[in-house]
A protein has these predicted regions:
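Short, surface-exposed "cap/lid" segments of acyl-processing enzymes
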Residues: 3-60
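Catalytic nucleophile-loop/oxyanion-hole region of alpha/beta-hydrolase
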Residues: 34, 54-82
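Active-site-proximal flexible loops/turns
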Residues: 33-34, 63, 97, 120
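Serine-dependent carboxylesterase/thioesterase catalytic core
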Residues: 69-153
């Protein structure tokens, strides 16, 4: 059975001599404990010779800040001699795509169920309550700005 270890901000699992690194970001909510929420998937990847690094986070409306924090966490544990692949699920895809290096620090990205919905669509209760309270709330960057940032890379 693979052994998970916490190294700095990252949870890691993998062989002692990996063929590469998979940097994983989970979806909103599930990303708080990726070593538990995505255990079967990530351990299967590690059994195939990859060192899996997961950054855990609590969701916020500032997705750009989360993307920078995740990127810094991965960068602090970088294995310079190994190829890097980025794997994201849902909001984790968005965070990888918003990384400050614009993907230049990896050989490829696998993005599962990319979520770029607005705040009121992602959080239905917010969509119901915000108009009644006379407030408007949106992620930063919002959906249109996210697509503009991604396509300009």
């Amino acid at each position: 059975m693979p052994t998970w270890r916490q190294r700095g901000e990252l949870w890691t699992v993998g062989p002692t001599q990996p063929k590469g690194v998979v940097q994983f970001l989970g979806g909103s909510g599930l990303g708080a404990s990726p070593q538990l929420s995505y255990k079967r998937l990530l351990e299967a990847v590690s059994r195939r010779g990859w060192l899996v690094q997961c950054w855990s986070y609590l969701p916020s409306f500032d997705h750009q800040l989360l993307a920078v924090q995740a990127w810094r966490g991965f960068r602090s544990q970088r294995q310079n001699d190994l190829p890097v692949l980025r794997l994201g699920h849902s909001m984790g895809c968005k965070l990888h795509l918003l990384a400050p290096d614009q993907g230049r620090g990896c050989r490829g990205e696998a993005l599962l169920s990319f979520n770029n919905f607005s705040a009121d669509r992602s959080i239905p209760l917010l969509g119901e309550l915000a108009p009644r309270l006379g407030v408007r709330s949106e992620f930063s960057p919002g959906p249109e700005e996210t697509l503009r940032l991604i396509t300009s890379q």
